[in-house]
Swiss-Prot record:
Family named by the database record: Belongs to the SMC family. SbcC subfamily.
Disulfide bond entries: none
InterPro entries to which the protein is assigned, alphabetical: P-loop_NTPase, Rad50/SbcC_AAA, SbcCD_Nuclease_C
Organism: Staphylococcus aureus (strain JH9)
Gene expressing this chain: sbcC
Protein's name in the database: Nuclease SbcCD subunit C
Length: 1009
């Protein structure tokens, strides 16, 4: 991420300010300088706030960022443009505030844009979703951004000196290690659940074991006394328990089957004795009833004689009944013939009346024919009547319009002739304008080249003078530095390392005496006198330091001058003096004026000719349009006259209205005549059809009557023959027999019932005699008592068996459940063993006493320290290295950092470092942290980094080393910005973003030293 442009409104001390970072060339190292409180850090706050809605330091709240001098009606807002992965984005964030005069807060706003084809297109327009979009785009949140892109005032030192708990919070945020702690909690909960499930499984096994039925059997009771925790023993005892339960069930089942067989025997004997008793009683009763039935035999014989006579007279009765039906049909046929004749007479009368109407209608036929002919001839006129009507209406208007168009056309022709006379033989000359323009352009180019060359020569002279001055300064400073180095070489440097050991030597002298062994060299002490002049050593050491400081300052100045000479050389190489014309500026300006005047004159002439041509074209177009309109008028006038002639010729009318009235009247008369004619024809056709139908009906009825008369004659002959056969002389004999017909059904039923019962008695008596033959009837009471005893015994044993069988099956189900629980428990213990071990390891119960999260954080910290030591070695002249404190870890320990001193070959606490050494270590650690986070995050693009304060604690040499480190960052393609009050940095860093304050508001500007 590389800043391009920052715009602040009412933000901190900036009421309305813009910072253009595009002025920083080639990721140049630059300094942000200004007085305390001027708002240098606020620039970092603005970037962080624009992206995440937070300041660059955790202590500053959003409400603290708004300017106290802001207009109460204006919001606080930041607009930040930046480049990421060769794509340009812009964010605009407006903070929430209470507008002056309102009581409710105006909500925050946030918009994210991306540049596409040179224009910004919106990507998000909501605060929450927009901030999330930025987090996903950059690949970091606000806390990670502070550690990677912006190292705020005092923030990057905090990570170096913090304890394990504080480092854990920082590293947890940067590397998202909370997920490992979440894994530990999940495993802990899973372990708790598994233990609860296992305990519940043991309880279920114990409950099932206690519920097993013992049947009051000593062997089963002995098996059930086993403790349920001994699941292996339970598995061994379950088959024994099931086998003993089956033995008990088999014994009860054998007793039950014996009782059932005894019950079935007595039940069968009792049933057979009861059936025999019922059969004997039934046989005696049937014999008595059969004797009584036989007494009805004479009456049945008389009934059969009557039924025979009724059967013989049936044919005669059918013939008599048929005669009555035929006589009824003959009477009905005669009635139908009479009705049909009357209908035919009425139809003939109706036809005569309609014939009269038809004759009257035909008398008007000639008149209707003439009207029909008129309609056919003028139908085409009537269908297009509006066209002819419009012709009568338009003809006068068209005549007037034609005369007017003729006058206008003549006027336009006269105007065209006048314009053509004005143009004459003149023509536009655009090639001459092009030639004059080219000449003017060439003259201007020659004038510009002369002016640019004069300016370039002046700039070149100035740069060469500056370069010569810088080279002279370098030569002078080089001479001074060589003299100082010669002077430094002549100093006596012996015993200088004893300068700060005076107190140490005094302590040793006070602790030893002459003749003792020296604790330093091991030799015998000969003298305790003063052999070292510490004042002289200190004086020489101060003089040497002063010379070294002067040499270092001169080297720094030479480096600055070399950098400035390089910058001047780049500017000189960019100066280009072009080849110019031999003419003077005065001659060129005169030629330029002449060509410009000629150009203006030609343009005016061309403009006049074009205007005349345009007017000519316009008049020509108007004449053409007028001619078209005149032609159209003449065509329409001719059409109107032709239509009027056509109408009057065909219709013989000269009035449209009269024609329409007569035409419609004729159409109405013809339609009425045609409808009436059709109606009469339809009526005649209907009458003819109806008469034909009635004539057919009459023929049918007459044929029926003849058929019925023949049937009646044949039926009479059959009646006479039957009466002769039955010896019947008259109708009285027949009527007497017919009277019996009302009782025939009753007589037949009585006869059939008698015969049926007679046969049933014979069959039943024979059956019962066969069932009771040779059989002895036993004592019923005695049999009943024995039956009840056997039944009660059987039911008792069946209930006992059912209970034992249910309990045995229940025992089997419970033992199967116990086996299933035990198998599941064994498998569960086997499967969860790895989870138990993993949960203990993750929770810190391992050989290092480290939780999973702390183990991961230690890994990342080691990576960060290794990366930081690469720079710290350079900055500390290979003296210091950061190391992680190797202590027995537990919980949150293991993240403390110590420093290893290669001079003493010992590690010591980080707080023992001086202020400058602490800054070196903090900077190296912060840069290492930044690079490791970038490696782990993958998508993060670190194209810039900003550092706030910390350089004031460094001496000259250390400052140079720190700057070299930051310059190395610049060479890797990263923009590096520094906030500092150190004046030396202003001389070392040529580009400065200066922040000025007038106690009311602040402003910024880029300047070069």
């Amino acid at each position: 991420m590389k800043p391009l442009h920052l715009k602040l409104n009412n933000f901190g001390p900036f009421l309305k300010e813009e910072i253009d970072f595009s002025k920083i060339d080639n990721n140049e190292l630059f300094l942000i300088s200004g007085k305390t409180g001027s708002g240098k850090t606020m620039i970092f706050d603005a970037m962080t706030y624009a992206l995440f809605g937070k300041a660059s330091t955790e202590q500053r709240e959003e409400n603290d960022l708004r300017s106290h001098f802001a207009d109460g009606k204006q919001p606080m807002s930041v607009t930040f443009e930046f480049q990421l992965n060769h794509r340009i984005y812009k964010v605009h964030r407006q903070g929430p505030y209470i507008k002056e005069g309102n009581t409710t807060k105006t909500n925050a706003k946030f918009d994210v844009f991306e540049m596409v084809d040179g224009k910004y297109e919106i990507r998000e327009s909501k605060v929450i979703s927009g901030t999330q979009f930025i987090i996903e785009l950059l690949g970091v949140n606000a806390d990670q951004f502070r550690q990677l892109f912006i190292l705020p005032q005092g923030e990057f030192k905090r990570f170096l000196i913090s304890n394990s708990r504080e480092k854990q919070g920082i590293l947890r945020t940067l590397f998202d290690s909370e997920k490992f702690e979440a894994i530990r909690e999940i495993l802990k909960e899973e372990l708790k659940k598994e233990k609860a499930q296992i305990e519940n499984r043991y309880q279920q096994i114990d409950l099932l074991w206690q519920e097993i039925e013992s049947f009051d059997d000593d062997k089963i009771k002995g098996l059930l006394e086993l403790a349920t925790q001994q699941i292996d023993k339970l598995i061994e005892n379950i088959p024994l328990l099931q086998a003993r339960s089956k033995e008990i069930l088999a014994f009860v089942n054998e007793s039950k089957e014996t009782a059932i067989k005894e019950y079935e025997i007595i039940e069968k004997k009792t049933l057979e004795n009861n059936i025999l008793k019922d059969n004997i009683n039934q046989l005696n009763k049937n014999k008595i009833d059969f004797v009584q039935l036989k007494e009805q035999q004479p009456e049945i014989d008389e009934i059969e004689a009557k039924l025979k006579l009724l059967q013989d007279i049936t044919n005669l009765l059918n013939y008599i009944e048929n005669r009555e039906k035929i006589e009824t049909k003959i009477a009905n046929s005669k009635k139908d013939i009479s009705k049909t004749n009357n209908k035919i007479l009425n139809l003939d009368c109706d036809k005569r009346n309609i014939d009269k109407e038809k004759k009257m209608l035909e008398e008007n036929g000639d008149l209707i024919e003439s009207k029909t002919s008129f309609i056919d001839k003028t139908r085409v006129l009537f269908n297009d009547i509006n066209k002819y009507q419009q012709s009568y209406l338009n003809i006068e208007c068209l005549i007037t319009e034609g005369e007017q168009l003729g006058d206008e056309l003549n006027n336009l022709i006269k105007g065209l002739e006048k314009v053509e006379d004005s143009i004459g033989n003149n023509e536009s000359d655009y090639e001459k304008i092009i030639e004059l323009n080219n000449a003017i352009t060439n003259i201007n180019n020659e004038i510009n080249i002369i002016k640019e060359n004069e300016k370039a020569k002046a700039e070149l002279d100035k740069l060469l003078g500056s370069k010569q001055e810088l080279e002279n300064q370098i030569n002078e400073e080089t001479t001074i530095m060589k003299n100082l180095e010669i002077k430094l070489d002549h100093y006596d440097k012996s015993k200088l390392d004893l300068n700060d050991k005076e107190s140490f030597i005094s302590e040793i002298k006070s602790a030893v005496k002459i003749g003792d062994q020296c604790p330093i060299c091991g030799n015998e002490i000969q003298d305790l006198g003063h052999h070292i002049d510490f004042d002289s050593i200190a004086k020489r050491q101060n003089e040497i330091k002063e010379i070294e400081a002067n040499i270092h300052a001169i080297k720094s100045n030479i480096a600055v001058h070399n950098s400035e000479i390089k910058f001047v050389n780049e500017k000189i190489s960019n100066i280009n003096i072009k080849t110019q014309s031999d003419f003077s500026l005065e001659v060129l300006n005169k030629r330029l004026l002449e060509n410009e005047n000629a150009l203006n004159n030609q343009r005016d002439l061309n403009k006049f000719i074009e205007q005349m041509k345009e007017e000519k074209d316009n008049l020509t177009l108007q004449i053409h349009n007028k001619q078209l309109r005149l032609n159209k008028n003449e065509s329409e006038l001719k059409l109107c006259r032709d239509l009027i002639t056509e109408f009057e010729t065909l219709s013989k009318y000269n009035n449209i209205t009269n024609f329409e009235v007569d035409y419609k009247k004729y159409v109405q008369d013809v339609n009425q005549h045609q409808e009436l004619s059709k109606e009469i024809e339809d009526k005649l056709m209907q009458l003819s059809q109806r008469k034909l139908i009635e004539q057919n009906n009459l023929n049918h009825y007459e044929n029926q009557l003849e058929t019925y008369n023949n049937d009646l004659e044949l039926n009479e002959q059959s009646i006479e023959m039957e009466m002769s056969r039955l010896n019947l002389t008259d109708d009285n004999d027949i009527n007497e027999i017919i009277a019996w017909r009302g009782e025939q059904e009753e007589l037949e039923q009585k006869r059939d019932t008698y015969k049926k019962r007679y046969h049933e008695f014979e069959m039943e008596i024979a059956r019962l005699e066969s069932l009771t033959k040779d059989k002895e009837l036993l004592d019923s009471d005695k049999l009943k008592d024995e039956y009840e005893q056997k039944k009660e015994k059987m039911n008792t044993l069946i209930d006992e068996y059912s209970a034992v069988h249910y309990q045995c099956q229940n025992n089997i189900n419970k033992t199967q459940s116990i086996v299933s629980h035990i198998n599941y428990l064994n498998q569960e213990l086997k499967d969860q063993q790895e989870i138990f071990q993993l949960a203990e390891i993750v929770s810190g119960k391992n050989n290092k006493n480290l939780t999973l999260e702390n183990f991961v954080l230690i890994y990342y910290l080691d990576q960060i320290i290794a990366q930081a030591n690469l720079r710290l070695a350079t900055m500390s002249d290979n003296r210091y290295q950061l190391i992680r404190r190797e202590a027995v870890s537990h919980g949150l320990s293991g993240l403390e950092i110590d420093v290893f001193d290669l001079h003493s070959n010992k590690s010591r606490h980080i707080s023992s470092l001086s202020g400058g050494e602490t800054f070196q270590s903090s900077l190296a650690l912060a840069l290492g942290l930044s690079e490791i986070v970038q490696q782990q995050s993958g998508g993060i693009s670190l194209e810039s980094i900003f550092i706030d304060e910390g350089f004031g604690t460094l001496d000259q040499e250390t400052l140079e080393t720190a700057l070299d480190t930051l310059l190395n960052l610049k060479s890797t393609g990263r923009m590096v910005g520094i906030i500092s009050h150190v004046s030396e940095l202003k001389n070392r860093i040529p580009l400065v973003l200066e922040v000025k304050s007038d106690q009311y508001q602040s402003s910024t500007r880029f300047k070069r030293n």
